[in-house]
Design a protein with these regions (language model features):
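Conserved acidic
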Residues: 1-179
Length: 179
C-alpha cells in the first residue's frame, strides 16, 4: 500500500485524539466528497446522473478476505484454517450460483461483527479496527491509482464505482485493480 496524495487520512487515523468512534474525517478524494470513519468509508458525487461505461469495482467477501490475507481474524479463533475453509467453500458455491453460499456468507460476515461485540468470545477490537481501517486504506490506495484514468463516482467500504473515459480503458482498469 502506498498512499501518497491523501496522506491526511493516514494522519487522521494515527492521531490519538480521533480514537472516538463518533468522529469522522470529511475530505474530497478524486473530486468526490468522502467521509472516513471507524466504521467505514463512504463517498459519492451528489445527485449524479451520467451515461457511459461504468464499472463496479467490488471486492468479493472483502472483510473475510482481509482477515485471511493479513491475518486480521480474531486472535481468539483457535483454528483459523476452519475460517479459511468456510471462505473458500463460500466462494466456490457463489461461483456456481448455489444458494447454499448464503449461510457461509453469514458465518463469514458475522465473524467480523463478533470481533466488535465485547460479550462475544471472538471479541478483538484491535483486529476489527485493522480490518475496517486497513480495508479503507487499501481502497484509498486504489482510488489514488485510478483517479487519473477514470472518473470516481462513488465509493464505500468494499468497493468503488467508476466511469471509464473510453470502453478501451477497461483492460487498464482491470490491470490496476489486479495489483
Amino acid at each position: 500500500m502506498r498512499i501518497e496524495k491523501y496522506t491526511e487520512v493516514l494522519n487522521w487515523y494515527k492521531n490519538p485524539l480521533n480514537r472516538d468512534y463518533s468522529k469522522t474525517l470529511e475530505l474530497d478524494v478524486a473530486g468526490v466528497p468522502h467521509v472516513f470513519a471507524w466504521g467505514g468509508l463512504h463517498g459519492a458525487i451528489p445527485k449524479y446522473h451520467g451515461e457511459g461505461w461504468f464499472v463496479n469495482v467490488d471486492v468479493a467477501s472483502y472483510y473475510p478476505s482481509l482477515m485471511l490475507v493479513y491475518k486480521w481474524l480474531s486472535r481468539n479463533v483457535h483454528d483459523p484454517s476452519k475460517y479459511a475453509e468456510i471462505y473458500h467453500t463460500r466462494l466456490k458455491l457463489k461461483a456456481e450460483k448455489n444458494p447454499m453460499q448464503q449461510p457461509y456468507k453469514i458465518v463469514l460476515n458475522s465473524t467480523y461483527g463478533a470481533m466488535k461485540d465485547k460479550h462475544n468470545a471472538m471479541y478483538d477490537p484491535r483486529q476489527a479496527n485493522n480490518v475496517c481501517v486497513g480495508g479503507q486504506l487499501l481502497l484509498l490506495d486504489l482510488i489514488e491509482r485510478l483517479e487519473d484514468h477514470c472518473e470516481i463516482i462513488q465509493s464505500n467500504t468494499d468497493g468503488i464505482l467508476v466511469k471509464l473515459r473510453r470502453y478501451e480503458d477497461f483492460e487498464m482498469l482491470d490491470d490496476l485493480c489486479w495489483e
